[in-house]
Amino acid sequence: MKTPVTSKLQIGAWLLSLGLLTACDASEPPKPTASSGLVPTEFQAGETTFNTNCAACHGKQAAGTDHGPPLVHKVYEPNHHGDQAFQRAAANGVQAHHWQFGNMPKIESVTPGDVDQIVKYVRWLQRQAGIE
């Protein structure tokens, strides 16, 4: 005959085992997303350069501001504004044509390599938002 203490110990041991199995889940950790605030390592240089040179107008995570348009928008999808469009915009500036924010000046503080990193970061943000 089991005593109430023995039954409680068995139930406690079973629950502890279940808890340990759950804690030892071997699945991969969730992948970083823009909304999680975690940017994958390969896009962090672009994020830093974007934040220094672009975010004042284009906003945090390229979401736009009252000074410039969002780059995470279907207007800037790769099939409409390819990667070279970003290079030209940084090197030459852009005459306003989609938005009413005024013309974008050329950005002399970035190199073509910097723009490549910025584009990789922006494209990653776009993919996170379902813009392919």
Where are these regions (language model features)?
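Bacterial N-terminal signal peptides that target proteins for export
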Residues: K2-A13
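Short functional micro-motifs and their immediate structural scaffolds
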Residues: P29, A62
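The canonical Cys-X-X-Cys-His
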Residues: G46, F50-K60, K106, I118-V122
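Short, solvent-exposed mixed-charge patches
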Residues: I131-E132
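C-terminal motif of bacterial Sec signal peptides marking the signal peptidase cleavage site
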Residues: L20-A23
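Gly/Gly-Pro-rich "capping" loops immediately C-terminal to redox-active cysteine motifs
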Residues: S36-G37, T41-F43, E47, A63-A91
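Bacterial signal peptide processing site
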Residues: D25-S27
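Extracytoplasmic electron-transfer domains, predominantly the class I c-type cytochrome c fold
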Residues: H73-L125
